[in-house]
C-alpha cells in the first residue's frame, strides 16, 4: 500500500470515528483511533501514517510521536475535507 492511499484511508477513518469541534473541523482522540478494530486491521503503522499526514498538513496534533496509553487523549484534527 502506498502512503497516499493510506492517508486517504486515515482521513475516512477520522471522519467515521470523529466529531466536529467548535471550529467545524473533525477530530478524534488518538486512543479511539488506535483502539478501533477496523483501524488496527487497516494500518500496519498507524503512527507512521499519522506522521506522513501531518507533514502534508492533512491532520494536526500536539507533539511529534504518539504512544498508546500515554497520548490516548491527544486530539487528531482533520485540516482538509
From Swiss-Prot:
Segments forming a coiled coil: none
Name of this chain's protein: Costars family protein ABRACL
Domain of life, source organism: Eukaryota
Family: Belongs to the costars family.
Sequence intervals crossing the membrane: none
One of the GO BP terms on file: regulation of actin filament-based process
High-level lineage: Eukaryota, Metazoa, Chordata, Craniata, Vertebrata
Organism this protein belongs to: Coturnix coturnix
Amino acid at each position: 500500500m502506498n502512503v497516499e492511499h493510506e492517508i486517504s484511508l486515515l482521513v475516512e477513518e477520522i471522519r467515521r470515528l470523529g466529531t466536529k469541534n467548535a471550529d467545524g473541523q473533525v477530530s478524534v482522540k488518538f486512543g479511539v483511533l488506535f483502539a478501533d478494530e477496523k483501524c488496527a486491521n487497516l494500518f500496519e503503522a498507524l503512527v507512521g501514517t499519522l506522521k506522513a499526514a501531518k507533514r502534508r498538513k492533512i491532520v494536526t496534533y500536539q507533539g511529534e510521536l504518539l504512544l498508546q496509553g500515554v497520548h490516548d487523549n491527544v486530539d487528531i484534527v482533520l485540516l482538509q475535507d
